[in-house]
Amino acid sequence: MARYRRRSRSRSRSRYGRRRRRSRSRRRRSRRRRRRRGRRGRGYHRRSPHRRRRRRRR
């Protein structure tokens, strides 16, 4: 019984844990990196005031 339980736990953890962690980590990392670079970088400061001014003028 001990061997069967150990195998079932290891398989369940490897299938669910690895797939969920890898899929979420890749998606979140790619999206967070792109958004953080744009907001902290050149585009965020220049784009935010321009968008507000254009909307008010229109």
From Swiss-Prot:
Alphabetized InterPro entries for the sequence: Protamine_P1
GO biological process annotation, one example: chromosome condensation
Tissue: Testis.
Membrane-spanning intervals of the chain: none
Compartment(s) where it occurs, according to its Swiss-Prot or TrEMBL record: Nucleus; Chromosome
Family: Belongs to the protamine P1 family.
The protein's name: Sperm protamine P1
Organism, as annotated: Monodelphis domestica
Lineage, uppermost ranks: Eukaryota, Metazoa, Chordata, Craniata, Vertebrata
